[in-house]
Amino acid sequence: MSATEFIRLKKANCTNCYKCIRHCPVKAIRFSGGQAHIIQDACIYCGECFVICPQNAKWIYSETEAVKSFLLQNEVYVSLAPSFISYFDTGISCMKDALKKLGFAGCEETAVGATIVKNAYEQLIQEEKKDVLISSCCHTVNLLIQKYYPDLLHCLAPVVSPMQAHCRKLKQEHPGCKTVFIGPCISKKDEAERYMEDVDAVMTFDELEAWFNEEKIVIPKDFEACEMSKTRLFPKAGGILKTMVKNQPEYVYLSVDGTEQCMEYLEDIRHGNIHHCFIEMSACKGSCIGGPLMIKRKEKILERNLQIERYAGEKDFVVAQPDENTIHKEFENLEYSTFIPEEAEIRKVLLRMGKKKEEDELNCGACGYDSCRAKAIAVYQGKAEMSMCFPYLRKQSENMTDIITDHSLNAILVLNERMEVQRINPVAKKLFHIHNEADILGESVTTILDPDLFVDVLDKQENVYEKMQYLSMYHIYVETTVSYDETNHFLICMMKDVTEEVKEREKRVAVIAKTAEVADHVVEKQMRIVQEIASLLGETTAETKIALTKLKESISDE
């Protein structure tokens, strides 16, 4: 395992879309706390997650500052990957001049090292020591075999990569110098760290371009011809085969590119379906010119192929072939193995995921795994979270919604913008005398209610709260709240049956009115009695007054 994490995560950008795990050919990504984490021991540095991430949440560790520090202390030589022509759209002479302006002592094409490697391949085929021989130029392919097909390590050509071969040559020619490989590949950073005696640093074309821009170095477009540059074809699919002398009729020469296609070939080799073959194997579709950093630029692969074809010569670079032992390479068994749980444990996880029976296993792949079973195993291994299952989350959400709506004391209706019923809860069904939910779902709300209020809310985009209505069709009073969901374009209606409350209120009003009427009658009667008493008292008083007056007069006369 490399000490450095070359593909890193911007946590703030990760939005749990699971696109990276869906596209990772070896599922070397785990999710924890809603964040993607690369499993270094499992990663083959194909860069697929970096390319595919829609949020740009992955970034590549830059070695630019390390290279700048080299330039202050040492002579530094560049091994430039032949795919530079497709990235910078210029020839090697212009690139050499630009790199010298940055302070590099010199630059050569890695294609020189590719010549050494292809000569070694030809020699191995000539010796016929291997039934199946796989090219070992692509570090991602090497890691794929080392980690996932260690039983096929004997098929890997025991030869250094063009980068290693060339950087060794540069170090021999310039003792004490530092070497920097510059190319389109992320996995070369990992390879360099594993073989530090050959390569001191690896920069991507992106890093170099940023440095040129920083120094305001403009590279002219100039393409010089060079007849002896056949191995400039190495970065295109089938390019290695095109440079090789194929003089062994017993061997079939095959080319395969793309990690998944490589894995299919490796499965066939494992099962003994392929014999007497030399296989050029590249992890990137289109080989190096289809690498992760090339794809990010979005140029068409056909244009890149044409550039490579036009720039390559007809003959090999003139280079002394090193001794076989000096370019020999042994590949370590880096097998990545994980514990596969017992069937009972897998079933337990599936049950927790809501997969109670086989029909529940949708195998939709939204979580990034090919099947629900594979996802359950990943959950058990701690690589995946239960919540990564979209159908599971949806079901959980729907279950929660069902619980809320089904147990609500109010009638709930959900309508679309065409006023069609999308959902109705049990209280609403009872209120509107609906026996079968299917009879109303998808039907116009006009079959059960006057739509005017809903139309008004939709037109004005203004919610209505606790509006009192009398539904004459059902002889009930309701308090109606209608709100519009702009995001999902739904009208949500809640109705509270207040018929009993209204009746109680009407009864109270009637009692109060009756009581007031009785009180008025009593008051009126009392007033009458008072008036009668007053009248009688008045008459009596008058009679008494008359009698007393007469008595007074009679006494006075005497």
Give the ranges of each region predicted by the language model.
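Sensory coupling linkers of modular signal transduction proteins
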Residues: 484-529
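Sensory modules in modular signal-transduction proteins
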Residues: 396-429
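PAS-family sensory/regulatory modules and their coupling/dimerization elements
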Residues: 451-500
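Short, charged amphipathic alpha-helical "coupling" segments at sensory-output junctions
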Residues: 386, 390-407, 504-511, 522
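Iron-sulfur-associated redox domains of electron-transfer enzymes in respiratory
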Residues: 61-337, 341-351, 370-377
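PAS-family sensory/regulatory domains
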Residues: 437-452
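PAS/PAS-like sensory domain cap-loop motif
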Residues: 428-440
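Iron-sulfur cluster-binding cysteine motifs and their immediate structural context
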Residues: 6-9, 15-39, 44, 48-63, ...
